[in-house]
């Protein structure tokens, strides 16, 4: 039996999936999870629907409570930030905050490990915008942000703080945003998954919404045929879509007042910046860890890095694409959970490959639902050695005589041979 615990850095999807599987695989061994924040294991994809008002309680998005983690035999330490990794000594350096658990507030810890999983996730990219400078400017990157946006949108006289009850939310931030005048016009910068779903959410809350996309169409991974349908749906629902229109600046003194772009500016009192995410890998600077072209941690078929006994999973790690066989980075929840479980089994003594990924994703735009899988980008297909052909067909979603039948567009990309 290993004298030192299996140490996990990060208490979200990949980290807690790994810890849970490890405990099932090796019930006599110890696993310790360090999470620098207060939140663990929540449904990121559900946050736009909380903001829309379709989900009443923020706590409904929590997948695993600290009490449930304890019942699984997981030594979970929230409020504990791993600040450095020493792979030569096999230890991590940890700082606990004033509200930390299982430790005196502010104390430093040197924690040895038998194996280490880095599951530090990703963070919202902001491009040239510093959303911290202006009230009413946000990124939707965690549960505190979702709660703050929801509070900011609400009328100060009618905001219900019960929507965030029984959660570790930043209550001062919520209180501050709930006291602001309710916005009327919103700009969403970025037409990816978050941008499209937030456009729906904000329209449902009664705002005038402008969606800005730098490239020629929204939802780049889905291709133009799907994007055209989505843009039509957004427009019919009252969203003004600005494609091929990069936003240059957020204007305002203390509160967001306008977004500026080539050719003009639009007055707004809410801005959501959703221009992608970046992997959190700075923790491993100076360790000799290998990173992929995306900046994510390079891993093999079992989630192992080039450092001895160090694994990586989730939004901070690469994976292999099932179509091309090449290294890729697709920060999606399904990938994080699956790779975490596989690594937990491997470290527990049952070597399990993390599996290739096919890039499966779904997104909803009002009443339109879109899904994708595989390799849709023809340029990438050519780079992978294929001779791609593309075709879009329209068919019924079910037999024509059955109620609810609707048109379904399917875009297929195949190798010519």
Cite the ranges covered by each PLM segment.
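A Rossmann-like FAD-binding core segment of flavoenzymes
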Residues: 28-30, 76-105, 110-111, 205-299
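FAD-site-proximal beta/loop scaffold in flavoenzymes
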Residues: 133-177, 254-258, 262-345
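Conserved N-terminal Rossmann-fold NAD(P)-binding element of oxidoreductases
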Residues: 9-10, 118, 189-190
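Nucleotide donor/acceptor-binding cores
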Residues: 4, 29, 115, 135, ...
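Beta1-alpha1 glycine-rich phosphate/pyrophosphate-binding loop at the start
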Residues: 1-75, 196, 200-222
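Mid-to-C-terminal Rossmann-like scaffold of FAD/NAD(P)H-dependent oxidoreductases
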Residues: 319-416
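Rossmann-like NAD(P)H-binding beta-loop-alpha module
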Residues: 144, 148-226, 237-239
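Haloarchaeal acidic low-complexity proteome signature biased toward cell-envelope/secretome components but also
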Residues: 1-6, 13-16, 21-27, 47, ...
């Amino acid at each position: 039996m290993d004298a030192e615990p299996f140490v996990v850095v990060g208490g979200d999807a990949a980290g807690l999936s790994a810890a849970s599987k490890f405990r099932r695989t090796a019930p006599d061994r110890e696993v310790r999870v360090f999470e620098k924040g207060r939140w663990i294991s929540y449904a990121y994809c559900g946050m736009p629907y909380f903001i829309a008002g379709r989900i009443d309680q923020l706590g409904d998005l929590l997948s695993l409570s600290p009490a449930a983690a304890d019942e699984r035999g997981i030594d979970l330490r929230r409020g504990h930030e791993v600040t450095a990794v020493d792979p030569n000594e096999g230890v991590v350096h940890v700082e606990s905050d004033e509200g930390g658990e299982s430790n005196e507030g502010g104390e430093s810890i040197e924690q040895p490990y038998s194996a280490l999983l880095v599951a530090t996730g990703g963070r919202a990219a902001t491009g040239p915008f510093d959303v911290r400078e202006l009230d009413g400017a946000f990124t939707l990157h965690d549960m505190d942000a979702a709660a703050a946006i929801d509070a900011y949108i609400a009328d100060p006289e009618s905001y219900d703080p019960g929507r965030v009850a029984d959660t570790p939310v930043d209550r001062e931030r919520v209180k501050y945003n709930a006291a602001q005048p309710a916005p009327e016009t919103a700009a969403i910068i970025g037409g990816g998954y978050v941008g499209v779903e937030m456009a729906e959410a904000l329209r449902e809350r009664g705002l005038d919404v402008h969606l800005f996309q730098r490239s020629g169409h929204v939802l780049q991974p889905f291709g133009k045929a799907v994007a055209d349908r989505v843009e039509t749906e957004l427009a019919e629902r009252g969203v003004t879509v600005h494609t091929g229109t990069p936003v240059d600046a957020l204007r305002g003194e203390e509160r967001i007042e306008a977004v500026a772009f080539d050719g003009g500016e639009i007055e707004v009192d809410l801005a959501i910046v959703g221009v992608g995410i970046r992997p959190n890998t700075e923790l491993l600077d100076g360790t000799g860890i290998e990173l992929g072209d995306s900046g994510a941690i390079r891993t093999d078929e079992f989630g192992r890095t080039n450092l001895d006994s160090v694994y990586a999973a989730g939004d901070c790690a690469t994976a292999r694409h099932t179509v091309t066989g090449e290294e890729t980075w697709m920060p999606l929840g399904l990938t994080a959970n699956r790779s975490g479980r596989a690594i937990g089994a491997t470290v527990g003594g049952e070597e399990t490959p993390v599996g290739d990924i096919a890039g499966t994703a779904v997104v909803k735009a009002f009443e339109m639902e879109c899904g994708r899988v595989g390799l849709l980008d023809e340029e990438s297909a050519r780079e992978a050695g294929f001779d791609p052909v593309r075709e879009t067909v329209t068919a019924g979603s079910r037999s024509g005589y059955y109620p609810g039948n609707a048109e379904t567009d399917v875009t297929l990309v195949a190798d010519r041979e």
